[in-house]
Swiss-Prot record:
Subunit-level organization: Core subunit of respiratory chain NADH dehydrogenase (Complex I) which is composed of 45 different subunits.
Catalytic activity as recorded in UniProt: a ubiquinone + NADH + 5 H(+)(in) = a ubiquinol + NAD(+) + 4 H(+)(out)
Name under which the protein is recorded: NADH-ubiquinone oxidoreductase chain 4L
Top-rank taxon: Eukaryota
Gene name in the database record: MT-ND4L
Spans traversing the lipid bilayer: 2-22, 29-49, 61-81
EC number, UniProt record: 7.1.1.2
Species annotation: Mirza coquereli
GO biological process, one term: ATP synthesis coupled electron transport
Membrane topology: Multi-pass membrane protein
GO MF, any single term: NADH dehydrogenase (ubiquinone) activity
Family: Belongs to the complex I subunit 4L family.
Length: 98
């Protein structure tokens, strides 16, 4: 495994651990999720270019589209929660109430 793949995999696991450790704040969770999506994009691009799969060149672009949708929905939820409750602590909120 080349060193760039090891570094990207390490970045993914670091973002995953950050998401598990800093899950009390929504903004920290969103940043870690974006780091995970970025490392998945780079790793999938490298794998597709190394294996030369011509049929799956659109997969990283599709991953970026889903990452942009996830970021927009996450930021909209963050704004809604901070306007309603005045903070972004996830542990203090009961999001299942209507």
């Amino acid at each position: 495994m080349p060193s760039i793949s090891i570094n990207i995999t390490l970045a993914f696991t670091t973002a995953l651990l950050g998401m598990l450790m800093f899950r009390s704040h929504m903004m920290s969770s969103l940043l870690c999720l974006e780091g995970m999506m970025l490392s998945m994009f780079i790793l999938s691009t490298l794998i597709i270019l190394n294996v030369q799969l011509t049929m799956s060149f659109m997969m990283p672009i599709l991953l970026l589209v889903f990452a942009a949708c996830e970021a927009a929905i996450g930021l909209a939820l963050l704004v809604m929660i901070s306007n309603t409750y005045g903070l972004d602590y996830i542990q203090n909120l009961n999001l299942l109430q209507c």
